[in-house]
């Protein structure tokens, strides 16, 4: 059975939040978020990139079922995936930027390598 972090949210809210995080990440190439959210988003984003590397119609439809914007999917298949054609995983980099001012949660920047 697949394991996942609960992130203190109901399952539908967690899924929606992760879809939005991954979509924003693939759109901008970089996002700032908390460590645990970044770890979950990183895993899903890497799966999307690996699917996009296949490049077939079924892979495109699978990515479209998760990523919320069609333009992002188009960019993923035409620009991002070919860039990582020779790389087997490890498409992202995560580095800490210190605690958030309001609640002290540890923040990271997640970016494409």
Swiss-Prot record:
Q: Does the keyword Plastid apply?
A: no
The molecular function GO annotations come to: structural constituent of ribosome
* Record text on subunit structure and interactions: Part of the 50S ribosomal subunit. Contacts protein L32.
CC terms in the record's Gene Ontology section: cytosolic large ribosomal subunit
Protein family according to the UniProt entry: Belongs to the bacterial ribosomal protein bL17 family.
Which PANTHER family would you find in this protein's record? LARGE RIBOSOMAL SUBUNIT PROTEIN BL17M, RIBOSOMAL PROTEIN L17
Q: Which InterPro entries match?
A: Ribosomal_bL17, Ribosomal_bL17_CS, Ribosomal_bL17_sf
Check the record and name the SUPFAM superfamilies matching this protein: Prokaryotic ribosomal protein L17 (SSF64263)
Which domain of life does the UniProt lineage start with?
Bacteria
Q: Which UniProt keywords apply?
A: Ribonucleoprotein, Ribosomal protein
Q: What is this protein called?
A: Large ribosomal subunit protein bL17
**PROSITE patterns associated with the record:** RIBOSOMAL_L17 (PS01167)
Sequence intervals crossing the membrane? none
Q: Which GO terms describe its biological process?
A: translation
Q: Which organism is it from?
A: Clostridium kluyveri (strain ATCC 8527 / DSM 555 / NBRC 12016 / NCIMB 10680 / K1)
């Amino acid at each position: 059975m697949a394991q996942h972090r609960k992130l203190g949210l109901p399952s539908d809210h967690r899924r929606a939040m992760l879809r939005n995080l991954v979509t924003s990440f693939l759109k901008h190439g970089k996002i700032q978020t908390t460590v645990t959210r970044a770890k979950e988003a990183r895993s899903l984003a890497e799966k999307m990139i690996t699917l996009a590397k296949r490049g077939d119609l079924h892979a495109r439809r699978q990515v479209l079922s998760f990523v919320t914007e069609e333009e992002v999917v188009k960019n993923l298949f035409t620009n991002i995936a070919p860039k990582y054609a020779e790389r087997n995983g490890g498409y992202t980099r995560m580095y800490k930027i210190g605690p958030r001012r309001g609640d002290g949660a540890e923040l990271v920047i997640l970016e494409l390598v």
